[in-house]
Regions:
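"…centered on the first transmembrane helix and the immediately adjacent amphipathic helix/loop
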Residues: 1-63, 74
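Short, highly charged low-complexity linear segments
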Residues: 13-16, 87-96, 115-122
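Short helix-capping/hinge motifs at transmembrane helix termini and TM-loop junctions
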Residues: 34-37, 65-66, 93-94, 120
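Interfacial helix-loop-helix junctions of multi-pass membrane proteins
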Residues: 40-47, 82-110
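Membrane-embedded alpha-helical segments that form the functional core of polytopic membrane enzymes
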Residues: 67-83
Length: 132
């Protein structure tokens, strides 16, 4: 098993805890907004919002953790989060369960994972280097 420093980019990030905290706030916001009544007028745009939201979450955390295994764990976690939220929405009187929403969430996660294999995964490292 690899030491923790091999999994975290945090060794390279001066403000790792800040970035992690912002990511956790993002996750909490997604849970809150997903489980409160919201009226989105264009139903098909809803799928784009789902993919973008889950893509942003995955893209954020890909910058904090390194390695295929940790990225796979993140991807599975975010996909399961999307499934859980959809199931919970099925019990909400003003929301509904939608398999296509789950698919859109997964597509967003997978696209961000793929993009995370590029230089994109170092944006926070580069941002911090500009500030020093």
């Amino acid at each position: 098993m690899l030491p923790l420093s091999q999994w975290l980019v945090g060794a390279e990030l001066r403000w790792f805890r800040l970035w992690l905290g912002l990511g956790l706030i993002l996750i909490a916001a997604v849970f809150y907004l997903s489980l409160t009544p919201v009226d989105i007028p264009a139903e098909h745009l809803d799928k784009i919002y789902h993919a973008a939201t889950y893509g942003v979450m995955m893209g954020w955390f890909v910058q904090l953790y390194r390695g295929v295994r940790s990225h796979a764990i993140l991807a599975v976690g975010f996909i399961l989060m999307g499934v859980l939220i959809e199931v919970l929405q099925g019990f909400h009187p003003m929301r509904y369960f939608d398999v296509l929403d789950m698919l859109a969430n997964a597509v967003g996660v997978l696209i961000a994972w793929a993009i995370g294999t590029t230089a994109f995964s170092r944006i926070l490292v580069r941002f911090e280097s500009l500030l020093h």
